[in-house]
């Protein structure tokens, strides 16, 4: 459906917003159901239509200065029907990125122009999935269900901690008795009894402490395994656009933040929190000994807290800077190792080394600033501790001299105060770890809170036959990016061999990405056997589509495992048959290990042509009903290409084949050749038919290659 009429702008906007939330839309069906008079959707009809798509839509009135706090994109509703979509706001520059429904293109508006168009009415739109996602986002609250799940283990840890605190409470009392009773009365028999009892208490304390550490480490390890498994599953479920918009090093750096969370969970910080919980009991006993000395200890706590509150924001900023520098280093390292052949071929090692040295210096400098600040924080805590110790000693001595406190009671009080202050000091000293794990949770949340490809509610349709239809396709990779495909209409019949040619950047490969459902078009539908791919389960679809790219990646496994990657239990006969069709069987047979040869990382142990033939065999082995060759033979030598072309009739038999190529000789025998230019189909026909038009783009490209 084409949205050129002004009264259809509301329906067009709903289509775009629904597709933004990965919800398939049939515009004709919505128009038939909700636009009964053919005059466009009014506000009530628009909200009902949104509700029918399971979108949560709500009309609000907002002043311009409050727009920075709303969730975007949102529809700006105008009474004259000239609605537009607000996608982004730059508060500092006072600029607004909108999607113009009239021109089908993004526009950047200055403040004055936006004010002239904005009438104060907005429709906020969210999907149920996004609302659930926000409620279930990954942050510190994610660990609460995990704690509840393992509550039995944590209760056991709590019970052990209670006994440890009881022993910690008994030990000072033993010392008090020894100082005040045994030494004064020279009670050797009492001393022996107390010594044996103290030894038993110490032994139990050591055993229980070790048991608590073991139980706690065991439970946190389980949580760590769950988090790691969830992270990897989520990472693989992310859409292809997530990886295309981020550097590999950034993603790797975020995944490595799991190590920081693991160290925090298995460290002493959380057990210190348990110890701190029992401080109230110790305070009660200390108050019984001496209210004055207890007030000194209590008075020190705000200083510990104040110092931590003061240092935390600065530490967090420096940790952010350290992470950013580390991510830059990770990205540069991955890029350098991946492009090592290019670096050596161009002899640019000195330039790369110089860049690395600068980035490494920035990272080390950022790390040094973090360490320096952390040291200052720890020394501040130690200073407060020493001051409190001096005051306690001075005041305690006065109380002993005045007869208000015995020497044994003073020693016992100091031991009890140590039990209270020790976890406080440990927590204060571990504040850097807490700040670091907070950064790690945020960084990891960038991965875990990113929406995955939507599978829920998607249809797993029957085995596909191979009919493909592009209907009024308009597509761009980002809302503010140029249009890649514009008004593309194309029907491909089952079993047809289609060649697609055109200049670089004309949108050839983008068509195949839409077939694989890596993206959903901004407007229009991609249909396979009449089924809208926006409604289809991506995994169901991709299992039935074979794809061979210009640069294919092999995994560090055997040739057999690479060919049978989608079905490891596949019979050897099928693997060999696919390899023969791809022209790979002969060179594989000549290898010492044959099909069991390990190809190395990314297939480094093979030549480019050999890697490509294995990739073709991998695409053929599952007998896909749709086969896509995206410049698949451009990296082959002439002999290998000749083998592939010789087998092409057998390869294409019983399936729909799409061949994207710059070399026109590759597609000249196709049933139909599609010629693309600037995102549109400008010509189509057989090889001879297209050559017959001297003014056509195909004829022009053929002439260039003939020369």
Curated annotation (Swiss-Prot):
SUPFAM superfamilies: ABC transporter transmembrane region (SSF90123), P-loop containing nucleoside triphosphate hydrolases (SSF52540). ATP binds at residues 502-509. The active site is at residue 83. The keyword Nucleotide-binding applies. Its main location: membrane. GO terms for biological process: killing of cells of another organism; protein secretion by the type I secretion system; proteolysis. Residues 468-703 form the ABC transporter domain. The sequence shown is that of serotype 9. In strain CM15 (serotype 1), disruption of this gene prevents production of both RTX-I and RTX-II toxin, and no hemolytic activity in mice or pigs. This is Toxin RTX-I translocation ATP-binding protein. It comes from Actinobacillus pleuropneumoniae.
